[in-house]
Amino acid sequence: MWLRALVLATLAAFTAWGHPSSPPVVDTVHGKVLGKFVSLEGFTQPVAVFLGIPFAKPPLGPLRFTPPQPAEPWSFVKNATSYPPMCSQDAVAGQVLSELFTNRKENTPLKLSEDCLYLNIYTPADLTKKNRLPVMVWIHGGGLVVGAASTYDGLALAAHENVVVVTIQYRLGIWGFFSTGDEHSRGNWGHLDQLAALRWVQDNIASFGGNPGSVTIFGESAGGESVSVLVLSPLAKNLFHRAISESGVALTAVLVKKGDVKPLAEQIAIAAGCQTTTSAVMVHCLRQKTEEELLETTLKMKFFSLDLHGDPRESHPFLGTVIDGLLLPKTPEELQAERKFNTVPYMVGFNKQEFGWIIPMLMGYPLSEGKLDQKTAMSLLWKSYPLVYIAKELIPEATEKYLGGTDDPVKKKDRFLDLLADVMFSVPSVIVARHHRDAGVPTYMYEFQYRPSFSSDMKPKTVIGDHGDELFSVFGAPFLKEGASEEEIRLSKMVMKFWANFARNGNPNGEGLPRWPEYNQEEGYLQIGANTQAAQKLKDKEVAFWTTLFAKKAVEKPPQTEHIEL
């Protein structure tokens, strides 16, 4: 009898506390939103989930290529229980990336829309009480041309670590980064959307049980680069308090356009059938195009693919961040050298084989035979110019350095991929971390070296720590998908704990975790994988080699000055 009473009492408590009888409704600055409660196995307290909350006015019509405007208020209870559309992009590439990276049991097919400035919230807070939990704001990757917030389910991270997880969207591709390099279309619209989302968090997250005074921004790939840009931007001051860049920083050359951006703007205008006489003419014409017409233009531009035929110096596989004088007053290199950035604790890391499989596969590198000779490697490295910006005359030395030590064509292929990974990810990440450390701010570095069981069957078994592999651990995929080993479950628990500790305290260390040294003059960092351990001097030899090599090019080509014959 007492057992039945205990069960009934437990059920009553569960209705009141575990799964409240009515779904959550929260009052935001703009109006009320209705969410849903979702329970994760092993947790009595459900997570309140709100999907598709608008944080800005839809950037349509005359608002295309302009900074985001505040959302319009509403007077009813807005239903926030279904996924928002992802921002306009190449639907096939976007879907492929989502399927490869999602931590959900089933990938969610998403609609496309130019009206896409929405965010999702996962809060484990008891909304009847005044909680103040740390907030973690996720910025998705996808080369600034594809991607969606809803690929990443914040449920496991929120439940396991008692943090509020917010995943945000931002305009992509032409919509997000079209720049004429002048006042007609400055560019960086997608980054301004990220800032608008962070302002929304400041104004509203307390109502969801989050602490606006403890906001961590974290992102991967182009999301990591975005985090790094926000760390450098005066416009982001006080909008976040810690930052994590996974596999991407503002020195990732492919994502930051320096110099004249006009030729790329003209290429886009021509592809859209617009005149290119002046910036004003191009912008006016592109604003008149329908979303479908700009999608066709996007496909013509062949973003995310390697051009094997044309002049690599005129190829643009990505549209990127620009030095607009506002978001970025100067180049990332100059802002770092002058130590003009937001001095928040910063975690920077990358994976052991960033060019292992997913990027060369998506970009169409001709490596299906799995081997490479020196001559082909040099030619491919030149074709990779828009990714790595290695001048033609430096290619023999760079290729020899990486591939020269072996005659095995399979090893040559692997070393070629290491070269690309170092120039695009590892070396820029270490340089950013060193600058941050030198400014006297807590800095932590990691290298992720693990092959998730959720990897695509097409990925060679030898690839361990591919681009994006850490996402499964960070977002607790083993607790949402089936089939993870005990080792993988433990790894994900540890990674979530490290990331959330960092969000809580600006320091990833905590009880029962391997010690993660701060990145100081000794350059200690953490190797994360089946065996997680501290090590030193991450990629220091590679940084030295590339710094010296790139300096040669700078020395050989002094600034052009007019030469006057007397």
From Swiss-Prot:
Covalent S-S links between cysteines: 87-116, 274-285
Q: Which Pfam families match?
A: COesterase (PF00135)
- Please give the chief subcellular localization of this protein: endoplasmic reticulum
The chemistry this enzyme catalyses reads:
a carboxylic ester + H2O = an alcohol + a carboxylate + H(+); cholesteryl (9Z-octadecenoate) + H2O = cholesterol + (9Z)-octadecenoate + H(+); 2-(5Z,8Z,11Z,14Z-eicosatetraenoyl)-glycerol + H2O = glycerol + (5Z,8Z,11Z,14Z)-eicosatetraenoate + H(+); prostaglandin E2 1-glyceryl ester + H2O = prostaglandin E2 + glycerol + H(+)
**GO-annotated molecular function:** carboxylesterase activity; sterol ester esterase activity
**Which branch of life, at top level?**
Eukaryota
What is the E.C. number? 3.1.1.1, 3.1.1.13
What quaternary arrangement does the UniProt entry report? Homotrimer and homohexamer. Binds to beta-glucuronidase.
Return the protein name: Liver carboxylesterase 1
Native species of this protein?
Macaca fascicularis (Crab-eating macaque)
**Chain's gene name:** CES1
